[in-house]
């Protein structure tokens, strides 16, 4: 089995739209979204290598020093699957973007380190 890093992507526009929802509607969506996310985790437990977590603010370290930056990454999970396609299919209809205001999930293979 190969390992894949899945990054949850969100946009400021989607979050702003979410925040404009009526509080009662938003709370109902949060409750159903949390349940759906837990159900997704249970259904895919055999594929999940690392449950991951939400991500906080970003710092960039470079030859120019350390700076604050913004990106669209909101969380991650590591899964295992036979192929890149199979890993991506795990996230079809994921609550991150079907219930919550997430934009998408980007999935990339974790490649082995080169060397002896």
Question: What is each model feature region?
Answer:
Residues 1-116:
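Conserved, structured core segments of small domains
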């Amino acid at each position: 089995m190969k390992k894949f890093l899945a990054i949850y992507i969100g946009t400021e526009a989607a979050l702003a739209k979410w925040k404009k929802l009526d509080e009662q509607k938003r709370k109902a969506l949060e409750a159903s979204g949390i349940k759906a996310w837990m159900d997704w985790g249970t259904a895919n437990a055999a594929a999940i290598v690392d449950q991951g977590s939400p991500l906080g603010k970003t710092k960039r370290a470079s030859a120019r020093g350390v700076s604050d930056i913004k990106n669209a990454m909101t969380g991650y999970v590591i899964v295992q699957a036979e192929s890149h396609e199979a890993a991506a299919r795990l996230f079809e209809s994921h609550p991150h973007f079907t219930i919550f205001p997430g934009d998408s999930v980007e999935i990339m293979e974790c490649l082995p380190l080169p060397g002896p």
